[in-house]
């Protein structure tokens, strides 16, 4: 597909210095200080007093930073490796993205524990809303002027802020939990929706509005997800999405696992993405360690990641068509996924959650006969996609239910932090595999599928075409797989290559320490973004020179996509909401982490 409104993306700018010169010209030499990191972008420290001035300046530059990609915090109180950093008990960071520059920038603010207050950025980027709520929920940092600063991940009755360093990280550190009748009644009352809290009216001039709970247990909600609908008949006047039911504290867990042992936890973020979840994490750790993996590792990782892109998209396709009323296709798509899992299981030994990538490589080399299995799949799937398109996607009922439904443009998508197929369906040609190649994607030939209307139908068609492009990439891996080792020969490769452990005592000691305690990563910060199955996923890691991460920030695409729901669906029918939810392609584990 092509789009007349495609946005032109320039070559990727790593540590773009042009914006630094522009900011110095506008703000003066004392407007900010720079921090050296391995994030691949300029990192600026600004004072709280000048924060909004700097953010507004960046938002309105000639080539603006149109997307607030991420916003979160760090508890700095136990951090020991702080050379060159300002004094801070807590830090809040703003990760901004400019498509016109094809570069990112991070703004940081240092805060004292005695004064945890910042002005809200919701007037600059509307999607700052949920991010600021999460920072308040998990750190207790207040954003003055925020329209509704309440808990978002934790229950409304929760006490404390879980990502603080003085908050317990293990269940055994808490008192035993018991749910008394009084506690149950308290929780039920806390979950009651009150329209006035959200600025909603209970009725119009001549009628009362109905408030309907969709979820948290509803098949069309695609997980433990609640949306409170304000209805005038069948029309949605407004709605309030409520998340957090699937929150498992993944970022807190990362602080108590070694760099190596956290890999299986990444599989459970987007639990349909498999090793696609491992990729940004191990790439970020490898940046910290300074590891350059062999070409064979890059190709193996890309091949398996694209297999999981296909399995995720096949599940999306079947459930999406089912959401709008067709029951049969979901059985076919699940059968087709089984063919892909046959290949994945033969290579990795597992199906949904292989946890197969390693720091510096992969768990083991490709098995004998892998090429035959891959070729059979590559030859078979394109014909199946043609059948789906002919039998289901050109169906007049499906098109009537989805064309023109839940439509938004590129500007709106960027304002809300939308990435992936949801952004490309508006005509914006931005795919990290092309725009900012990682893990060897620059060696592959493939197209970036686009559409023009940004509606529910286009989002589906973009993903179908993405599966065809994934097949192209896998086929190139099959035909051009390099020879060589499946692990880097580096001291921090984990587990290290075992072949020399019986000959060299130093290698044996390294192997023992890294398997038992885990590798010690150099102090610093690194970030890796990838084009995951549902949009852009990234890991922002802070190392304090230990065997465990000091701070692991997991930015998922689905969190941003659900925040956009009210702005898109107001004025539509309830049936349109169901089609819209299906077209987003989300899982709540990816939202709630």
UniProtKB/Swiss-Prot annotation:
The keyword Chaperone does not apply. It is a peripheral membrane protein. NDH-1 shuttles electrons from NADH, via FMN and iron-sulfur (Fe-S) centers, to quinones in the respiratory chain. The immediate electron acceptor for the enzyme in this species is believed to be ubiquinone. Couples the redox reaction to proton translocation (for every two electrons transferred, four hydrogen ions are translocated across the cytoplasmic membrane), and thus conserves the redox energy in a proton gradient. It holds the Pfam family Complex1_49kDa. Keywords: Cell inner membrane, Cell membrane, Membrane, Multifunctional enzyme, NAD, Quinone, Translocase, Transport, Ubiquinone. The keyword Zinc does not apply. Residues 1-184 are annotated as: NADH dehydrogenase I subunit C. It comes from Ectopseudomonas mendocina (strain ymp) (Pseudomonas mendocina). Residues 208-593 are annotated as: NADH dehydrogenase I subunit D. InterPro entries: NADH_DH_suC, NADH_DH_suCD, NADH_Q_OxRdtase_suD, NADH_quin_OxRdtase_su_C/D-like, NADH_UbQ_OxRdtase_30kDa_su, NADH_UbQ_OxRdtase_49kDa_CS, NDH1_su_D/H, NiFe-Hase_large. This is NADH-quinone oxidoreductase subunit C/D. NDH-1 is composed of 13 different subunits. Subunits NuoB, CD, E, F, and G constitute the peripheral sector of the complex. Its EC number is 7.1.1.-. It catalyses: a quinone + NADH + 5 H(+)(in) = a quinol + NAD(+) + 4 H(+)(out). Its main location: membrane. In the N-terminal section; belongs to the complex I 30 kDa subunit family. It is an enzyme of class 7 (translocase). It comes from the Bacteria. It is found in: Cell inner membrane. GO terms for molecular function: NAD binding; NADH dehydrogenase (ubiquinone) activity; NADH:ubiquinone reductase (non-electrogenic) activity; quinone binding. GO terms for cellular component: NADH dehydrogenase complex; plasma membrane.
């Amino acid at each position: 597909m092509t789009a007349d409104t495609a946005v032109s993306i320039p070559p990727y700018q790593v540590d773009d210095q042009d914006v630094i010169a522009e900011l110095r010209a506008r703000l003066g030499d004392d407007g900010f200080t720079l921090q050296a990191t391995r994030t691949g972008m300029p990192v600026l420290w600004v004072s709280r007093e000048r924060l909004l001035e700097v953010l507004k300046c960046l938002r309105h530059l000639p080539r603006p930073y149109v997307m607030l990609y991420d916003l979160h915090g760090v508890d700095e109180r136990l951090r020991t490796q702080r050379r060159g950093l300002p004094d801070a008990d807590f830090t809040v960071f703003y990760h901004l993205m400019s498509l016109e520059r094809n570069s990112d920038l991070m703004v940081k603010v240092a805060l004292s524990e005695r004064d945890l207050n910042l002005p809200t950025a919701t007037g600059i980027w509307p999607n700052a809303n949920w991010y600021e709520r999460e920072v308040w929920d998990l750190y207790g940092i207040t954003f003055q002027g925020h329209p509704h600063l309440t808990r978002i991940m934790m229950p409304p009755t929760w006490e404390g802020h879980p990502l603080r360093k003085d908050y317990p990280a293990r269940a055994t550190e808490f008192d035993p939990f018991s749910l008394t009748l009084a506690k149950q009644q308290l929780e039920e009352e806390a979950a009651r929706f009150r329209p006035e809290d959200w600025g909603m009216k209970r009725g119009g001039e001549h009628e009362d509005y109905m408030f309907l709970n969709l979820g948290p247990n509803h098949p069309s909600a695609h997980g433990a997800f609640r949306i409170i609908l304000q209805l005038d008949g069948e029309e949605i006047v407004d709605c309030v999405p409520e998340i957090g039911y699937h929150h498992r504290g993944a970022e807190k867990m990362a602080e108590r696992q070694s760099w190596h042992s956290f890999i299986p936890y990444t599989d459970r973020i987007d639990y349909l993405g498999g090793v696609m979840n491992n990729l940004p994490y191990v790439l970020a750790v490898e940046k910290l360690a300074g590891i350059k993996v062999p070409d064979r590792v890059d190709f193996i990782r890309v091949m398996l990641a694209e297999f999981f892109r296909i399995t995720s998209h096949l599940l999306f396709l079947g459930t999406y068509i089912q959401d709008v009323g067709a029951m049969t296709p979901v059985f076919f798509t699940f059968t087709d996924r089984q063919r892909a899992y046959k290949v994945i299981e033969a290579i990795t030994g597992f199906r949904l959650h292989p946890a197969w990538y390693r720091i510096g490589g992969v768990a083991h080399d490709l098995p004998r006969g892998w090429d035959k299995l891959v070729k059979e799949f590559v030859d078979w799937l394109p014909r199946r996609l043609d059948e789906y398109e002919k039998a289901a996607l050109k169906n007049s009922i499906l098109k009537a239910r989805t064309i023109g439904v839940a439509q938004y443009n590129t500007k709106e998508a960027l304002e809300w932090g939308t990435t992936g197929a949801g952004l490309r369906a508006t005509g914006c040609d931005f795919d990290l595999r092309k725009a900012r190649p990682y893990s060897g994607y620059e060696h592959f030939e493939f197209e970036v599928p686009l559409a023009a209307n940004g509606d529910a139908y286009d989002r589906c068609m973009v993903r179908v075409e993405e599966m065809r492009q994934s097949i192209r990439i896998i086929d190139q891996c099959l035909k051009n797989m390099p020879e060589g080792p499946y692990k880097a020969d580096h001291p921090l490769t984990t587990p290290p290559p075992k072949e020399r452990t019986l000959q060299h005592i130093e290698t044996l000691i390294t192997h023992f320490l890294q398997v038992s305690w885990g590798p010690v990563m150099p102090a610093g910060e690194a970030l890796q973004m990838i084009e995951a199955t549902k949009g852009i996923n990234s890991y922002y890691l802070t190392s304090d020179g230990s065997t465990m991460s000091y701070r692991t920030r997991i930015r998922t695409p689905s969190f941003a996509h659900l925040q956009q729901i009210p702005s898109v669906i107001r004025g539509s029918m309830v049936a349109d909401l169901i089609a819209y939810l299906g077209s987003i392609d989300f899982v709540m584990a990816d939202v709630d982490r």
